């Protein structure tokens, strides 16, 4: 396969380069990644300003390009310009740090995969614990085996897989749902040399989801979580409830009385 790799940690990130080296043993690899860290950029794209792209000689086994854009930009340019739309799969990662629960809203890594799904190719976001001695080689071989054996045709269009690795040895993988995992934010006021006040944000993880099939629960038990996510944010159940209100007698009465 021709696989496009990106990330949000930057083009020299260990997780990205090790994954690229492992996958290059069986696949054609194109790396297009931000020249510097783009963590927590979400699904931002660059408009009304240039996106610079340059080939870098980080590794010689396959082409690697650094851009001034976001992960979503990298996927767009990689697929539509550098690869002339000849890409079979997009993989974003391996990210340094998990992307669980509501992390996916903020994650540049996840958004890189969702951009691939939006462009119509099988796409994966891959994240790992943020620790120095994490075994990226083992994780990369897991991903290599996974993409060879998983039937991506079973997924609905515009769906990506969000994959997270556990801290220790891998017991296997489990299909999971996105958890209710939020942050209790803290803001520390600081002063710059000119006397201006700025803020430094911290966040304490709040994991209050009791379901055993949620992503962080599975990861905490030593399994790889595989969560299907979509580019669409529609709440189907709420839409049905809203339609009931729209078609209800009370709504029609209120509308007529206000006309």
Curated annotation (Swiss-Prot):
GO terms for cellular component: cytoplasm. Keywords: Cytoplasm, Hydrolase, Metal-binding, Nucleotide-binding. InterPro entries: SurE, SurE-like_Pase/nucleotidase, SurE-like_sf. Gene3D superfamilies: Survival protein SurE-like phosphatase/nucleotidase. Pfam families: SurE. A divalent metal cation binds at residues 8-9, 39, 95. Binds 1 divalent metal cation per subunit. This is 5'-nucleotidase SurE. It comes from Pseudothermotoga lettingae (strain ATCC BAA-301 / DSM 14385 / NBRC 107922 / TMO). The lineage of its organism: Bacteria, Thermotogati, Thermotogota, Thermotogae, Thermotogales.
């Amino acid at each position: 396969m021709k696989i496009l790799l990106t990330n949000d940690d930057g083009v020299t990130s260990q997780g990205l380069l090790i994954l690229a080296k492992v996958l290059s043993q069986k696949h054609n690899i194109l790396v297009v990644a931000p020249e510097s860290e783009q963590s927590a950029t979400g699904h931002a794209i660059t408009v009304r300003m240039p996106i610079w792209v340059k080939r870098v000689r980080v590794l010689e086994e396959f082409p690697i390009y650094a851009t001034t854009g976001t992960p979503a930009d990298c996927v767009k340019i990689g697929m539509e310009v550098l690869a002339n739309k000849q890409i079979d799969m997009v993989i974003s990662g391996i990210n340094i740090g998990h992307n669980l629960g509501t992390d996916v809203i903020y994650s540049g890594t996840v958004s890189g995969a969702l951009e691939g799904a939006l462009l119509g190719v099988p796409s994966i976001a891959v994240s790992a614990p943020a620790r120095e001695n994490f075994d990226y080689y083992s994780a990369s071989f897991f991903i290599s085996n996974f993409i060879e054996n998983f039937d991506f045709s079973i997924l609905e269009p515009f769906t990506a897989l969000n994959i997270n690795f556990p801290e220790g040895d891998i017991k296997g993988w489990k299909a999971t749902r996105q958890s209710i995992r939020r942050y209790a934010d803290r803001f520390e006021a600081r002063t710059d040399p000119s006397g201006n006040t700025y803020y430094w944000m911290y966040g304490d993880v709040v994991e209050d989801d009791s379901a055993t099939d949620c992503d962080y629960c599975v990861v905490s038990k030593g399994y790889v979580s595989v969560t299907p996510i979509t580019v669409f944010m529609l709440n189907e159940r709420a839409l049905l409830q809203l339609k009931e209100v729209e078609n209800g007698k009370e709504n029609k009465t209120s509308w007529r009385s206000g006309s």
